[in-house]
Amino acid sequence: AVAAKELAFPSVVIADAGIKTASALEAFFMAEVPDADVLKVRRLAALYIIEASFEGINSDIAFAQMCLETGFLRFGGLITEDMHNFCGLGAIDENNRGCRFNSEQEGVRAHIQHLKAYGSTEELRMPLADPRYRWVQPKGKAPDVYALSGTWASDRQYGEKLAGILKRMARF
């Protein structure tokens, strides 16, 4: 039987604990994109949970944001898969295509740290991986997904889009 917590709607608060297991995140992702690389999705789901737990950040939100920012790992914009940039960090235009990271783990850590800069005033617990962390001011300016609209991204519906992904994730 699935625990009641597993069926609960994920929190929209950034500095909160995620409730989804890696296998639930994987099942959600594969339901959305059945032809995705399941091993990559499995690795990323585990990394998001681990890295988010280090920083006290909601892994459900971070994973959902990765899905939104990468088009469910299809990429296709300024960021390419080999950049290990799962959240559009530094991507502005053709002259500023975004930050490049050496590994999936480093890219996930940078994403979690950048999300922490928006969602919390607490100091980082892990070594800095996010080259843009210092530019987020004031720290904690977006305590939930809705407050990311117009700040993390210029899209005024950004928070609604993230909440929509979290709602779909709630079934897993």
Q: Residues of each region from the PLM?
A:
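Catalytic cores of secreted/periplasmic lytic hydrolases that degrade extracellular macromolecules
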Residues: A1-F172
